[in-house]
Each structure stands twice: as structure tokens, then as C-alpha cells.
């Protein structure tokens, strides 16, 4: 009954925000448990170097973000704390990894295939017929008939 009275004291917007925060916190807790359940070395063995970098950056960013939230709950302004520079540094590396990933996904041009494609696209059957006809006419003027 005391809980009902306490809940009624809060506006519904705050109650909704608290419920959202609680569900988000549970989700984060489940993700952290999933990450911690397998050893880091086992997890890294299954990944290529780029994926390893992504995992390390994601872990560092998540940990620093949680520390940011901790500072807020303690009344410390995180914008004046060195954690802000650390998050910016991690974000810079995340952008570098994203650029590398985008470059890998970018289309590569096969010059030989492109030249064949252009050559064949420009080829015209009528031109070929005209060329064959003129060659045949020129050969026809100088044809020798031999009797065997």
C-alpha cells in the first residue's frame, strides 16, 4: 500500500521514463552478462582483426558511457570531466574503423572487364555488315577463277 502511494506521487511522464530506464538497464545487464560469459580470448579468436577492433572499441565506448552515467548520478558534470575527451577519442577511432569498413565494401573496378563491356556496347552489327560487304566487294574485283 505504501508503494501505491509512492507511485501516485510521481507524474505519469516520470513513471514512464523510470520504467523505460529500468527496462534499458535490464537490457544492458543482459548484454554485459553475454559478453562476460565467454572469455575475451575465445571471442577474439573467432573474429578477424577488423571485427576485433570493432569489439574492443564498442566495449571501451560502452564502459566509458556507463561511467558517464555514473558521474551524472553522482552530481558531477561529465562535460567538465576527462571522460568526455576519452569518449571523443574512442569515437575518432570508431570513425576510422568505419572508413576502413566502407572502403572494403566499396565496389572495385575490373579495368579489363570494363573495357570489354564498353567495346561490346559500342559494337554495332550494321557496321560489321558494312565492313564485311566492302571487304567482299574489294575482294570480288580481284578474284581469279582457276579451272582445275
Swiss-Prot record:
The family this protein is said to belong to: Belongs to the C1D family.
Alphabetized UniProt keyword annotations: Coiled coil, Cytoplasm, DNA-binding, Nucleus, RNA-binding, rRNA processing
InterPro entries the UniProt entry points to: Exosome-assoc_fac/DNA_repair, Sas10/Utp3/C1D
Region: Disordered, residue numbers: 128-148
PANTHER family, alphabetized: NUCLEAR NUCLEIC ACID-BINDING PROTEIN C1D, SUN-COR STEROID HORMONE RECEPTOR CO-REPRESSOR
A Gene Ontology biological process term: maturation of 5.8S rRNA
Name by which UniProt lists this protein: Nuclear nucleic acid-binding protein C1D
Coiled coil: 83-107
MF-aspect GO terms: DNA binding; RNA binding
Function per UniProt: Plays a role in the recruitment of the exosome to pre-rRNA to mediate the 3'-5' end processing of the 5.8S rRNA.
Chain intervals with Basic and acidic residues compositional bias: 128-138
Transmembrane segments: none
GO cellular component: cytoplasm; exosome (RNase complex); nucleolus
Subunit structure: Monomer and homodimer. Associates with the RNA exosome complex.
Pfam families in alphabetical order: Sas10_Utp3
Localization of this protein: Nucleus; Cytoplasm; Nucleus, Nucleolus
Biased composition (Basic residues): 139-148
Amino acid at each position: 500500500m505504501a508503494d501505491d502511494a509512492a507511485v501516485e506521487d510521481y507524474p505519469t511522464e516520470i513513471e514512464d521514463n523510470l520504467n523505460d530506464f529500468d527496462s534499458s538497464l535490464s537490457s544492458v545487464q543482459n548484454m554485459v552478462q553475454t559478453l562476460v560469459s565467454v572469455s575475451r580470448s575465445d571471442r577474439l579468436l573467432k573474429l578477424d582483426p577488423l571485427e576485433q577492433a570493432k569489439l574492443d572499441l564498442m566495449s571501451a565506448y560502452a564502459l566509458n558511457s556507463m561511467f558517464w552515467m555514473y558521474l551524472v548520478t553522482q552530481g558531477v558534470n561529465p562535460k567538465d570531466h576527462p571522460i568526455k575527451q576519452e569518449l571523443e577519442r574512442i569515437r575518432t577511432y570508431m570513425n576510422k574503423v568505419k572508413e576502413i569498413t566502407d572502403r572494403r565494401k566499396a565496389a572495385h573496378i575490373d579495368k579489363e572487364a570494363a573495357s570489354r563491356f564498353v567495346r561490346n556496347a559500342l559494337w554495332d552489327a550494321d557496321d560489321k555488315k558494312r565492313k564485311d560487304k566492302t571487304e567482299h566487294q574489294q575482294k570480288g574485283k580481284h578474284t581469279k577463277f582457276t579451272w582445275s
